UniProtKB/Swiss-Prot annotation:
The gene is aspS. Its EC number is 6.1.1.23. This is Aspartate--tRNA(Asp/Asn) ligase. InterPro entries: Aa-tRNA-synt_II, aa-tRNA-synth_II, aa-tRNA-synth_II/BPL/LPL, Asp-tRNA_synthase_2, Asp/Asn-tRNA-synth_IIb, NA-bd_OB-fold, NA-bd_OB_tRNA. Homodimer. It is found in: Cytoplasm. Aspartyl-tRNA synthetase with relaxed tRNA specificity since it is able to aspartylate not only its cognate tRNA(Asp) but also tRNA(Asn). Reaction proceeds in two steps: L-aspartate is first activated by ATP to form Asp-AMP and then transferred to the acceptor end of tRNA(Asp/Asn).
């Protein structure tokens, strides 16, 4: 019966096991050959002393190529110097598929490679244990998100990704051919989430792709990303901030508990964030930046440099709240007594924005005026606006970038490292 490398323990000494995997490395010392076999769970040492294995197996081991796929059946022995404290003395080795040489990428990471080179040969890059660890952790992150939101009473939904209207206005849209009509890839599930509040769902969440034709080509931008979105009725921005910070804390706790081995591969030690996360207003963030030499005119978005200065002072996870109404989308609710300020927030990790959210405008007339104030035509939002005429409850929500959450949690230098096959301004293949 097949076992994974991580399941082979010293206390199994004398037992016969079968393993499948890739040849990570071969060391030929003449009368002694070592093969490191790698599967998705780790690496185990296959030891072939000439005197204790068959001539056929020994001969095969000497000529086997790295990254070939093999099956090994043999006896478990204790060996403190070997990975995991065990080795396998094989009675048989079968080459299931031989790899070509030379390899397009060095899986052992002895030879460093630029990220672009790694992405060009992504299938090979993904074999690296450190890279696999990122995606095992990502799997746990998404599982924890679903479990937490389901426990909180949210209903998972899936909204259209082909739309006829820009969610947030602007030109960051990918046009597509949709029979005889003009259509776009959706920037966000925002409009549909809000319509579902009018439908009486009260609490919804979606985990799905978003598409933004942004010109930015930075270490934190993607043109296709996975967004974790919620919308919640009968609450305000403070209510959904509470959900967000508890969700993030739960994700950290679950990853720390269930992904200890993969965190070890990445040499990452997770610190569980404490609740509540610190909160500062937009004005306070401007003051911090100004004190450190970066002046931001009121009403403008905070520059990258300003956010870095604020992040240096705040550290870790924190909220920036009460943004200028004009800097947020048309659906953000302004304060009644200060209409120039919106009931909105961004969740930051250092200088990196992870999430953006707000209480939404739920009053039809106010929403129409807000759309007009942004220079858009209410007629373009017909299906959306109709939902506000027949009993739309007060509601709030947010969108959280899955890749940015993982990037910041693991200290990755580039958000593309958290995506299997990233899409950016210059990359459409693989």
């Amino acid at each position: 019966m097949r076992v994974y490398t991580a399941d082979v323990k010293p206390e199994m000494e004398g037992q016969k096991v079968t393993l499948y995997g890739w040849v990570h490395e071969v060391r030929d010392l003449g009368g002694l050959v070592f093969i490191l076999l790698r599967d998705r769970e780790g690496i185990v040492q296959i030891t072939l002393p000439r005197k204790f294995v068959s001539k056929q197996v020994f001969k095969l081991a000497k000529k086997i190529r790295r990254e070939s796929v093999i099956a090994v059946t043999g006896e478990v022995r204790r060996e403190e110097k070997a990975p995991g404290g065990v080795e396998i003395i094989p009675e048989s080795i079968e080459v299931l598929n031989e790899a070509d040489a030379p390899l397009p990428l060095e899986v052992t990471e002895k030879v460093p490679a630029e990220l672009d080179t790694r992405l060009d040969h992504r299938f090979m890059d993904l074999r690296r244990p450190r890279v696999q660890a990122i995606f095992r952790i990502r799997h746990q992150v998404m599982q924890s998100v679903r479990e937490f939101l389901s426990e909180e009473g949210f209903i998972e939904v899936h909204t259209p990704k082909i739309v006829s209207t820009a969610t947030e206005g602007g030109t960051e849209l990918f046009p597509i051919s949709y029979f005889e009509k003009e259509a776009f890839l959706n920037q966000s599930p925002q409009l549909y989430k809000q319509v579902l509040m009018a439908a009486g769902f009260e609490k919804v969440f979606e985990i799905g792709p978003i598409f933004r034709a942004e010109e930015h080509n930075t270490t934190r931008h993607l043109n296709e990303a996975i967004s974790i979105d919620i919308e919640m009725s009968f609450t305000d921005h403070n209510g959904v901030m509470d959900v967000l910070e508890r969700l993030v804390q739960r994700v950290y706790e679950d990853v720390a508990e269930k992904c200890e081995r993969y965190l070890g591969w990445l040499e990452v030690s997770l610190e569980i964030p404490e609740l509540p996360f610190p909160r500062i207003t937009y004005d306070e963030a401007r003051e911090i930046a100004a004190r450190k030499g970066e002046e931001i005119p009121w009403g403008e978005d905070l520059s990258t440099n300003a956010l870095k200065l604020v992040g240096e002072e705040m550290g870790g996870l924190y909220f920036i709240t009460d943004w200028p109404t004009e800097s947020k989308p048309f659906y953000a609710m302004p304060y009644e007594d200060r209409p120039e300020i919106s009931k909105s927030f961004d969740l930051m990790h250092g200088w990196l924005e992870l999430s953006s959210g707000a209480q939404r405008i739920h009053l039809y007339d106010m929403l129409v005026e807000s759309i007009k104030a942004k220079g858009m035509e209410p007629e373009s939002f017909g299906f959306y606006l109709e939902a506000f005429r027949y009993g739309m409850p007060p509601h709030a929500g947010w969108g959280l970038g899955a890749e940015r959450l993982i990037m910041s949690m693991l200290g990755l230098k580039n958000v593309r490292e958290a995506v299997l096959f990233p899409r950016d301004r210059h990359r459409l293949v693989p």
